[in-house]
Amino acid sequence: MIMSSYLMESNYIDPKFPPCEEYSQNNYIPDSPEYYSRARDTGYQHHHQELYPPRASYQERQYNCASIPEPDTPRGHGIPHSAHLLAGKGQPASCETPQLSMSPATPPAAASACNQATPEHPNSTASSKQPVVYPWMKKIHVSTVNSGYNGTEPKRSRTAYTRQQVLELEKEFHYNRYLTRRRRIEIAHTLVLSERQIKIWFQNRRMKWKKDHRLPNTKVRSSSSGSNTSSAAGGVAAASATNSGPDELSGAQHGEDITRL
């Protein structure tokens, strides 16, 4: 009922929200929103003027090379003595401009020196990256490849021991026929020889000592002992076969006698 009466009566006015025409007739609503913006501006300007008083008017002047102001000196440092002299004589401040322009010109010279030094740096890095080949890393017995290489390894040169080296090696062999690695290194350093040369000399010297004393070779001795053991085993097997023959025959005859009974 309330909704239908409200729709039928088109002239019904809600008392809470009066029409805008009454506000416009009574000048409650301004024609443009300038009213609010002006109120804000005026209030802000008034507050700004109270906090910050207006500055005094100053006359703008044009600057040129002769009227460049001097840079502010940092705290704790006074004005240079030359500036006092120039100010006392009445010379313009533009005379100091070359000094200001000269100071920035120094870094390019340093930069050029750095640029000249940089090309040498890659060479040093390249040389440092090259692997260092020590003498012990090289193969002494392998010769360089040449055009006349026929595929066979060249003959190794025979080491010629001096009289003093042979004497020291004979002394060591008299006390120790077999060397440890530590002792071999010590002898090699003492006689200025390689470990391989010391090892080969002792091997040859042991073979000579066995030949002089007529000692049998261990390899031949082991092979002969193996053949003797095999022959002995064959003889034992044959003897056991011959011994077991009559017993088997007597057993067979005894079985036949039992069956006959």
Swiss-Prot record:
| PROSITE patterns, alphabetized | ANTENNAPEDIA, HOMEOBOX_1, HOMEOBOX_2
Which regions are flagged for Polar residues bias? 114-130
Q: Which CDD domains match?
A: homeodomain (cd00086)
Coiled coil, from the record: none
Region annotation (Disordered) maps to 85-130, 212-261
Q: What protein family does this chain belong to?
A: Belongs to the Antp homeobox family. Deformed subfamily.
| Protein's UniProt name | Homeobox protein Hox-C4
Q: Which gene encodes it?
A: hoxc4
